[in-house]
Amino acid sequence: MAAAAGAAAAAAAEGEAPAEMGALLLEKETRGATERVHGSLGDTPRSEETLPKATPDSLEPAGPSSPASVTVTVGDEGADTPVGATPLIGDESENLEGDGDLRGGRILLGHATKSFPSSPSKGGSCPSRAKMSMTGAGKSPPSVQSLAMRLLSMPGAQGAAAAGSEPPPATTSPEGQPKVHRARKTMSKPGNGQPPVPEKRPPEIQHFRMSDDVHSLGKVTSDLAKRRKLNSGGGLSEELGSARRSGEVTLTKGDPGSLEEWETVVGDDFSLYYDSYSVDERVDSDSKSEVEALTEQLSEEEEEEEEEEEEEEEEEEEEEEEEDEESGNQSDRSGSSGRRKAKKKWRKDSPWVKPSRKRRKREPPRAKEPRGVNGVGSSGPSEYMEVPLGSLELPSEGTLSPNHAGVSNDTSSLETERGFEELPLCSCRMEAPKIDRISERAGHKCMATESVDGELSGCNAAILKRETMRPSSRVALMVLCETHRARMVKHHCCPGCGYFCTAGTFLECHPDFRVAHRFHKACVSQLNGMVFCPHCGEDASEAQEVTIPRGDGVTPPAGTAAPAPPPLSQDVPGRADTSQPSARMRGHGEPRRPPCDPLADTIDSSGPSLTLPNGGCLSAVGLPLGPGREALEKALVIQESERRKKLRFHPRQLYLSVKQGELQKVILMLLDNLDPNFQSDQQSKRTPLHAAAQKGSVEICHVLLQAGANINAVDKQQRTPLMEAVVNNHLEVARYMVQRGGCVYSKEEDGSTCLHHAAKIGNLEMVSLLLSTGQVDVNAQDSGGWTPIIWAAEHKHIEVIRMLLTRGADVTLTDNEENICLHWASFTGSAAIAEVLLNARCDLHAVNYHGDTPLHIAARESYHDCVLLFLSRGANPELRNKEGDTAWDLTPERSDVWFALQLNRKLRLGVGNRAIRTEKIICRDVARGYENVPIPCVNGVDGEPCPEDYKYISENCETSTMNIDRNITHLQHCTCVDDCSSSNCLCGQLSIRCWYDKDGRLLQEFNKIEPPLIFECNQACSCWRNCKNRVVQSGIKVRLQLYRTAKMGWGVRALQTIPQGTFICEYVGELISDAEADVREDDSYLFDLDNKDGEVYCIDARYYGNISRFINHLCDPNIIPVRVFMLHQDLRFPRIAFFSSRDIRTGEELGFDYGDRFWDIKSKYFTCQCGSEKCKHSAEAIALEQSRLARLDPHPELLPELGSLPPVNT
């Protein structure tokens, strides 16, 4: 094109430019303007979308005359004092006197589970009830969280408060009778020191438009291929020459009249070139374009200068050949210089082509003029030619002519092979000149018609090239998009009907193992009773009938410019992502930038480096020291020192070179701007980074990541490169990818994670590496329900099992057939692993779906050591599975296992009444699957069975109407789009701040003495379900166990180490009113929801409850109760959540302080048995207190006066 432009300029200066020159320049300018318009389409910005502003209703405090004004009764006289007012000293005096009267009242005897006889009461007629509370103080001043009161005064909460505040008339105490006091478990309330939450909404969330790095499709950079001489014989040449002279061309034996319209546009110039299927016939992208007949006469001086330039070029080519021989590098283009000589010689001798005219002298470089739609200049005469695949710029070029072994690359063999090839009957690989009226009639859209399961559909994709194509002379000329051009040259268009054979049943002819001619059965060529392939004319009687599914052949139309890279699931099979700049497409926008290297700052940046076409840099910076780094530096030095050859590669070749570990070739391909994220169906959507990780090449992984490879790309099995490194046991590659940001918790299609594979192969360092990130779930289950510890048990990796147990692996999780890891350990016969699991409190009597215990499996497999271990740990050999077999029935007679089971049976009969008891599991899950984790029940103290005198529930229930305000429109909610970690979260503001850290634990500064109210995000919030402010509503996450204590009946203990601030469980039971609590007989499970007098509500876990009903009192508690609101915000009905107040060891009993109000009533019947040094309610502590009071009784002057008592903090 540059030569054509120079010749045109010279002719115009002399005033002798022919008419064709003016048309040439005009057409070039028109095409350049069209290309600029198309190029600018990719840079058109998107319209910015913003979401409407959503502002919640602000909190309006209730006015003085509001009907929801809350008053709290202080004292026994029923005087109402507004909330927040400080009670008078006189009221406190009356309260103290009232408490003193209770000790002498008549007490109704309840059925407390943990009871001991006490001294007889002093008489009286006032019944009492024991209720647990949130604090240890007998009474606390009426205080409440100021923000919560504003919530209560909202219009939605007013009705519920008014409706629920009326006490039932049936339970009203008559006048003159003292108020009934009940012993309740209570908790402390937040004081007035908690600052009110400002009534404001979070600021408007700014929606920033993410600027996509859009790379529009670049113009095609390669020129038309150099013509090659046909050595198929003189007959063919003479025939074509005569056809050219006569102006008529006959391609088939059909009617030549169908070519009349085309011949009118084409003119006299016509040449036909047939391209072989070898890789070596691709043409260099820097080959010079030819412009024929720009002028008929040139001066002799110009011809002499042209001959001198040709001689200089020949000398340069000879120098390049010598350099190639010295370097010894073998490439696909080793015979390129020889072929260039042959082409030049042929170009001079051939009578078909007029001699080309070059510029007189070389001019300084100018700005490139815009090319036509097809990437070549619009000048020159129109010709009908079949061009090589390389010049068509097709994305599937590499699949048409692969480089097969044994194919010679030198020119002589190519000419010999070309001589034996026959001219095909079809014209699938021929290009006709541009016909403007055809493209304009089609609206510059693709004219292809696809045949899909017998149905026809058209393609409306935009075209890049206006040259026309057709499969045969029986089909009209049409302009095609790049996708259908690629399929046309692959002979996938039927020559009979002109439809593309996309999906359905077709015939395929294979004249060569590399080529498949596809056509319809009804479109075969018939002659003298024989059928022939309409493509090649071969006998079609042996053509294969193939059925192509819809997913394989249907390819979406290729657009001219893509706004953003498509997702991986929508990639066209076997095609590169053309929306990004590649080796043969240049984007008009900003080039892609590789991700920054996080290790670059820690390693010396000195060393060789290469700059990629996309702006990235290849260097050894960030690569750990070792052989891999040395090899990479050596490869970079070689690329810097040697003269780089201009080669052409298919994107799929990068994967193959990476798989073979060819570092030099990989760098060369990356320098040719091959896409490091290219995925093909032939490799199951695997990227080159997958292949590098599979091979274990750290240096290739390094250069691919520097070139912009996606470290978390997934293949068809959803496997990432990090998973490939773990599966293939490449520790260094895995460590490097973890440091570079590889996702360690992603899951495959079957649910397996990297930790599953590491545990399966037994690489302890790999497991330690993954666990050290803190991002993997040690109890993750795959599609079969198997956890990493189950895989390790099955493959006998005992050290991996020990490490997983130290990191919190749950040995009670079951797979899809309800097997636990102990079942798999017994299946493999590893007694050592089984003992480790049993020491980790694994259930020896667990049964799977078939009713088999680990003993059944070990006996069936005849593993003697496992059977002895299970029998020594108390396994019951008399248990039967679902088929009615015991372990003894499954054992071969007279075997070692059979004798062991027989001996154990006799020993069990002999020691049936032994004095020492061993702890045994009497229930595998008291929650019956209602909790996230199973809660087993064990008893090693007596023969008491698992308690069944209650109904296990996981949430509070009601047996009467409570009028709880659950209206979703009354909920205060946040509009966060993140994980609610910012200070703008409204739910966090309601709680003063969000009190949870990233692990869902309470912060260190949380007030454990007077816990504030916590408002978690609810169903009205805009945040995700897994946001940071949703802890209690996620349920129990720690492993607990119900066990029989020696002195306090049933208790609850931890089966794992629990850090401080961790959510344990919720106190769940039946919601009842205070009046209802006064008439209930058993008050051992009452928990007061508020710490003030008046109409309050309680939770009774006597008949309905969860595991928390078994938590005992501890004077030195390790858990604390906190009021939490989730599904509603009715302040009368908070939910009681228990959090750990300190670190809890494995096997330690859980307990909280019931409160002094509880022990004021219950201390007359039993005393505390916690055994703590700080115990305040044991028999010894009570005796010491009574002795102290007795000594002070004769000296009343030593007692402090009420007026001198310090005021109670509010």
UniProtKB/Swiss-Prot annotation:
PTM info: Methylated at Lys-185; automethylated.
EC no.? 2.1.1.-, 2.1.1.367
Q: Which InterPro entries match?
A: Ankyrin_rpt (IPR002110), Ankyrin_rpt-contain_sf (IPR036770), EHMT1/EHMT2 (IPR043550), EHMT_CRR (IPR047762), Pre-SET_dom (IPR007728), SET_dom (IPR001214), SET_dom_sf (IPR046341), SET_EHMT2 (IPR038034)
Return the protein name.
Histone-lysine N-methyltransferase EHMT2
Q: Which GO terms describe its molecular function?
A: C2H2 zinc finger domain binding; histone H3K27 methyltransferase activity; histone H3K56 methyltransferase activity; histone H3K9 methyltransferase activity; histone H3K9me2 methyltransferase activity; p53 binding; promoter-specific chromatin binding; protein-lysine N-methyltransferase activity
Tell me what reaction this enzyme catalyses: N(6)-methyl-L-lysyl(9)-[histone H3] + S-adenosyl-L-methionine = N(6),N(6)-dimethyl-L-lysyl(9)-[histone H3] + S-adenosyl-L-homocysteine + H(+); L-lysyl(9)-[histone H3] + S-adenosyl-L-methionine = N(6)-methyl-L-lysyl(9)-[histone H3] + S-adenosyl-L-homocysteine + H(+)
Keywords of the record, alphabetical order, are:
Acetylation, ANK repeat, Chromatin regulator, Chromosome, Isopeptide bond, Metal-binding, Methylation, Methyltransferase, Nucleus, Phosphoprotein, Repeat, S-adenosyl-L-methionine, Transferase, Ubl conjugation, Zinc
Disulfide bonds, paired cysteine numbers: none
Q: Which residues carry this modification: Phosphothreonine?
A: 44, 555, 1210
Chain sites annotated for binding Zn(2+) 1: 974, 976, 980, 985
Assembly description? Heterodimer; heterodimerizes with EHMT1/GLP. Interacts with GFI1B and WIZ. Part of the E2F6.com-1 complex in G0 phase composed of E2F6, MGA, MAX, TFDP1, CBX3, BAT8, EHMT1, RING1, RNF2, MBLR, L3MBTL2 and YAF2. Part of a complex composed of TRIM28, HDAC1, HDAC2 and EHMT2. Interacts with UHRF1. Interacts with CDYL. Interacts with REST only in the presence of CDYL. Part of a complex containing at least CDYL, REST, WIZ, SETB1, EHMT1 and EHMT2. Interacts with PRDM9 and CDYL; interaction only takes place when PRDM9 is bound to hotspot DNA. Interacts with SMYD5.
Q: Where is this region: Disordered?
A: 1-262, 280-386, 548-608
Signal peptide, first to last residue: none
Using the record's annotations, give every residue carrying the modification N-acetylalanine: 2
Provide the binding site for Zn(2+) 3: 980, 1017, 1023, 1027
Carrying N6,N6,N6-trimethyllysine, the residues are 185
- Binding-site residues for S-adenosyl-L-methionine, renumbered to this chain: 1048-1050, 1085, 1112-1113, 1169
**Taking every annotated instance into account, which residue ranges of this chain make up the domain Post-SET?**
1164-1180
Q: Where is the composition biased (Acidic residues)?
A: 298-327
